[in-house]
Amino acid sequence: MIRIFSTAQNKGLTNMMLFILRATVSCFMLVHGIGKWQMLMSGADTSQFPDPLGVGHSTSLGLAVFAEVVCSGLLFIGFATRLVVVPLIFTMIIAVFVVHGSQDFAARELGSLYLIIYLLLLITGSGKYSIDHFIYKKTKPTNY
């Protein structure tokens, strides 16, 4: 019973949950990104895609595709995690506060959840089950 209230972390379980979180959120975001990628590749009219930054509809779509497809793919494998979540955080900030900013919370809820998860991953990093961990382990200086 006392263990329920313990604040000690189980590193193995924490690393496994970071992997599950990364893999799940990446796959979910890829679902959003694939549709945008298909729109971009098909040469369809992009004038309906929001342009909140004033850089053009096609450029805005391209930036969203980069974040939601490329960065999500890299996040899935845990490569440069803290770097690749930055475009995802930026995309979610734009989606939540600019694109859906005037709508009720229900329209902003999913983007807010993604934003919180990406902020968490920015702080924690990818965990042990990632390419980042493998690279860091190989390049980490030894203490003499």
What would you call each of these model-derived segments?
Residues M41, L53, T91:
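Short, small-residue-rich loop/turn micro-motifs
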Residues M1-Q38, S58-F66, V70, F76-Y144:
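Extended, low-polarity transmembrane helix blocks
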Residues A44-H57:
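Perimembrane loop-to-helix junctions flanking transmembrane segments
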Residues Q38-A44:
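Membrane-interface loops
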